[in-house]
Amino acid sequence: MSLESFKRSIELGRQGFNQGFSMGLPKLEELIGGITKSTMTLLFASSGQGKSSCVLYSYIYAPLKEHLEDNKLRIIFFALEMKEDFIIAKLLSTYLYDTYHIVVTAKQILSIGKDYILPDDLYEYVQLGYDWLEKVYKVLTIYEGSFNSDKLIKVTMEELKKEGEFTENKYIPKDPEKVILSVTDHVGLIQPSNGRNRKGEIDDYTNKLVIIRNKTGLSPIIVMQSNRAVANMERKKNEAFMEPMVEDIKETSTVSENSEIILAVYNPQVDKRTTYRGYQVKEMGYRFRSILVLKSRYGENQVADCCFFDGAVNKWMEMPKPEEIFDYSRYRATNNSSIDNIIKNEDKDEKVKSKLDYSL
């Protein structure tokens, strides 16, 4: 890089080209810079802790909410685990809650369940979301099914060609300000090919993504499942080390080495913990999640963003500091949604209310 190139980078930053997009979680945005161009992110968790839900909320729903119609966002989603219909239903569930304050789960939207059919009153709300979804489909493209490294890279390149031109030495985007995300959920389901085992396939895929990232400004988000079984008994003796660590990443370490940002989703109640970093998590009825920043090349490492998580509508909200919480009852689940319980109880304690900002 020449001095002139460096000076240009500074000028582009002053023009706002390096500003991150919203993730719906202000503290996390401050820690990692939000969603930025040319940044590879690894997000992992053990099974059932909410890794896919976190990605759907912070890397898809939140930026869609902010950039749905300005043509500054493009999302390519490789769904190796979930079906496209269920992904869209989860996004719609969050949208309906944010817009109409109505709780309709993804399973309800799709009438999933024994003898369950979506009732007319909820169906009317679902129909109100169709116009929003029509706009979503213009920004978000979902590919579901079985993929190997070569197929994932081929589709990624085809999508990038729609957004710019590849020359012999560089990539010329149609809009330099546009952020293009590729989400792979989860990469552990990638299919081995060409004589490679699964580790080799993941390594091949992520190594090629690094090259594409450097050339095009693509921001890959890689979702992985961790292997908590690697934690030995010595680690279990110290509760601080019960949190996920980079060493827990399943299959391969190459992904972590290639990533600028590594996040881990953790539910301390899975480890039978009643308290966590000062929070009375047992009082929250399985609604507490910690998003751990294990690696960030542009900010702090080894810090936690402690969140309230309502799986019914896939809503994530950052918690106040533990010393600012005087009543945990508001965080418990109700018959509809635990978020409703937060709102209903906000007027009970003005001292607490003044310190809470859920941005609903």
Regions found by a protein language model. Give the residues of each.
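The Walker A/P-loop phosphate-binding site
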Residues: 1-100, 128-130, 356-360
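Cytosolic-facing regulatory segments adjacent to core modules
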Residues: 30, 66-177, 306, 340, ...
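Flexible beta-alpha connector loops of hexameric P-loop NTPases
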Residues: 17, 141, 191-203, 234-243
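Structural recognition of the conserved hydrophobic beta-strand(s) that form the central parallel beta-sheet
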Residues: 77, 183-184, 218-225
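Structural motif
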Residues: 42, 180-185, 221, 263
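C-terminal regions of RecA-like/P-loop NTPase motor modules
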Residues: 3-5, 97-103, 131-134, 150, ...
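Helical hairpin unit composed of two closely spaced alpha helices linked by a short loop
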Residues: 76, 172-212
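Signature of the SF2 helicase/ATPase Hel1-core->accessory helical subdomain module
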Residues: 189, 225-230
